[in-house]
């Protein structure tokens, strides 16, 4: 093994095709190719789309962390018929929502894929592939449409576990009588009024939903028929499908019903981001094992927001006023907490003075390594923000005020009323004001000489304490997400 070929730790993935956890063996040592089905771009993306993006972004980050050279491809299906209902040119509509999707992905701190192909840019390759499928006897043209013959694919249904005689074609839509088998699917559709179309040997038309491109990923709902059809047509055009591992993330549900636009039971990424920091949404989307369903929950989003806040040191941006050096009460309290932590460390070290110098140095190195390890884990999880702490905390406070339906002036007024009650020893009123704010997700913290507030999970019933310590949050995140996506050994 050369110096450049560093041995990678084993990576174990659950393969939908075999329904087993398998040790990943790349086709080319040190290199991994991932293809993930992207969105059909005709509207703002919902949090179900976000879960797929975050799940595979986590895999992408982890593989790079392990030292693999990763080629990550996520497509845009920009060929659709929704534009005719919007009075907008089809490609203009899709281009607009491709860009909106990329803004959402940036907010969620999803890394840009290596390539982001659009269907409309690859019509020539698609036509050549269809011609190859027909040439191999696996496809047939009828009246400008081209269908794939599932009878020519002996393994059809293997990925999803669907038997060919149980695919229930026609259950949701009428069966096209021109098909040789009701389960046959369209490789290309003849042009219709108001829809985008391209010239081909079979006339003007557009590709069906199943012409796309190691690892193939997507949402669980794509297993059948989308991915099943991909396998069938790719095998028909090429000797080898080129996919060894199939990964599928679970649905996001609303009241335990799959979230989707057809049921109008969804929330867009933008809607959630209007009330919560996008990284709180990312944290929420990673809060369950990636193949399991994830039920939408305001309380869970609140908990994720609280965790994100607790991970951020309590630092405020310096004032722009020249010569102003006075520290805020919150900053002073944070310094006090840091000093207490340092005092604890100093006491601990003083007890170890009798140790040999080498042992003491080992302790210091260990502390540095712990901090480094935590940062590495948070980076792999995509939770290290590029914002300054001041910018992050300011944004999270503003969104907490939005959720509470309050302005900061109103919160400060309540704090002043509470301070007056405390001075007059009306502790019942003081506690009541604090509790009422806590019910709205505004947590008051008394620090020397002042009272400050921070976002928190809304209080649902009286209790003695609120929030989690930063240390507890860090370790909870580390141990929760180490088993989120992968198993390495």
UniProtKB/Swiss-Prot annotation:
Motif 'KMSKS' region, chain ranges: 258-262
Motif segment ('HIGH' region): 39-49
Co-factor binding details: Binds 1 zinc ion per subunit.
Residues annotated for ATP binding in this entry: 261
Protein biosynthesis is among the record's keywords: yes
Keywords linked to the UniProt accession: Aminoacyl-tRNA synthetase, ATP-binding, Cytoplasm, Ligase, Metal-binding, Nucleotide-binding, Protein biosynthesis, Zinc
One GO cellular component term: cytosol
Catalytic activity from the UniProt record: tRNA(Cys) + L-cysteine + ATP = L-cysteinyl-tRNA(Cys) + AMP + diphosphate
Compartment(s) of residence: Cytoplasm, Cytosol
SUPFAM superfamilies attached to this UniProt entry: Anticodon-binding domain of a subclass of class I aminoacyl-tRNA synthetases (SSF47323), Nucleotidylyl transferase (SSF52374)
Name of this protein: Cysteine--tRNA ligase 1, cytoplasmic
């Amino acid at each position: 093994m050369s110096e450049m070929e560093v041995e990678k730790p084993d990576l174990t993935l659950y393969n939908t095709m075999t329904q087993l956890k398998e040790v990943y063996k790349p086709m080319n040592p040190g290199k991994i190719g991932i293809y993930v089905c992207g969105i059909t771009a005709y509207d703002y993306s919902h949090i179900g789309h976000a879960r797929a993006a975050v799940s595979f972004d986590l895999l992408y980050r982890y593989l790079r962390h392990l030292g693999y050279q990763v080629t990550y491809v996520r497509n845009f299906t920009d060929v659709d018929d929704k534009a005719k209902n919007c009075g907008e040119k089809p490609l203009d509509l899709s281009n607009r929502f491709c860009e909106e999707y990329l803004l959402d992905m940036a907010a969620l701190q999803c890394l840009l894929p290596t390539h982001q192909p659009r269907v409309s840019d690859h019509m020539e390759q698609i036509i050549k592939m269809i011609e190859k499928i027909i040439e191999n006897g696996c496809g047939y043209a009828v009246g400008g449409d081209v269908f794939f013959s599932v009878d020519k694919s002996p393994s059809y249904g293997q990925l999803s576990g669907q038997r060919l005689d149980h695919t229930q074609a026609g259950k949701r839509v009428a069966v096209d009588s021109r098909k040789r088998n009701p389960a046959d699917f369209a490789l290309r559709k003849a042009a219709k009024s108001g829809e985008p179309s391209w010239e081909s040997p079979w006339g003007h038309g557009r590709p069906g939903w199943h012409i796309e491109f190691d690892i193939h990923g997507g949402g669980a709902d794509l297993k059948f028929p989308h991915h099943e059809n991909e396998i069938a047509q790719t095998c028909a055009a090429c000797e080898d499908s080129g996919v060894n591992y199939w990964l599928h993330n679970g649905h996001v549900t609303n009241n335990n019903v799959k979230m989707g636009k057809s049921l109008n039971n969804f929330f867009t990424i933008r809607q959630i981001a209007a009330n919560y920091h996008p990284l709180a949404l990312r944290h929420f989307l990673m809060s369950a094992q990636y193949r399991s369903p994830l039920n939408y929950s305001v309380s869970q989003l609140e908990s994720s927001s609280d965790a994100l806040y607790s991970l951020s040191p309590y630092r405020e941006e310096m004032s722009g006023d020249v010569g102003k050096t006075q520290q805020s009460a919150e900053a002073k309290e944070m310094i006090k907490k840091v000093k207490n932590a340092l005092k604890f460390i100093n006491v601990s070290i003083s007890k170890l003075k009798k140790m040999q110098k080498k042992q003491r140095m080992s302790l210091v190195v260990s502390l540095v390594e712990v901090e480094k390890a935590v940062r590495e884990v948070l980076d792999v999880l995509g939770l290290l923000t590029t914002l300054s702490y001041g910018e992050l905390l300011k944004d999270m406070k503003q969104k907490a005020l939005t959720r509470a339906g309050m302005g900061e002036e109103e919160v400060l007024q309540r704090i002043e009323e509470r301070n007056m009650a405390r001075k007059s020893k009306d502790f019942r009123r003081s506690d009541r004001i604090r509790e009422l704010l806590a019910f709205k997700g505004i947590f008051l913290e008394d620090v020397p000489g002042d009272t400050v507030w921070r976002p928190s999970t809304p209080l649902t019933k009286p209790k003695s304490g609120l929030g989690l310590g930063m240390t507890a949050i860090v370790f909870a995140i580390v141990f929760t997400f180490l088993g989120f996506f992968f198993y390495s050994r």
